[in-house]
C-alpha cells in the first residue's frame, strides 16, 4: 500500500469524525422568547464541541507531521494507524455524552466524564505508539536523518500526551468541567510550534 493511499484513508476518517461533532449540537425546542436562555443553557455542548474539535484537528496536523518521516508502509504501521483511527472515530460519541451529562451531578456526570477521558487517553497512547514505531522500526521511518537529540525531543512531545490524558481520568471522578479543562490545555500544548519543519522523506510508494 502506498503512503498516499494510507494518508487519504486517514484524512477521510478525521474529516468524518470532526464533522460528526457538529451534528450533536441540538436545536432547542422552546416557547416564544425563551431561545436566548435555552442557548445559554447549552454551554456544556459548546465547550465539549470546541475542545473535541481542537483535539481532532490537532491530531490530524500532527498525524500529517509524523507521516512526513515515513519511508515505507508495512503491516505493523497499518494496524497501528488503524488503532489510532479507531479512537479518533469514537470521539464524537463521548463528546455528546459529556455535553449531555456535564451538569447532571453524581454518578451520571462522573461516568460521562470518565468515558470521555478514557477515550482521549487511549487516543493519546495510540498516537504515541504510532510515532515510536515510525521512529524505531527499521526501514519504516527516515528519522535516521535526524540528530538523536531531535528524535528524543519529538518522542517526548508525542508520547507525553498519554500520561496527561490519564490525569484527566482521575479528574473525571471529581469534576467533569475539570476533566474537559485538562483536555483543553493539552490541545493548546499540541497546537504550539515544536519539532521543526516536516518534510516527506524517501520513497513513499513502497508498501506491504
Where are these regions (language model features)?
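Multi-pass alpha-helical transmembrane bundle typical of ion/small-solute transporters
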Residues: 1-208
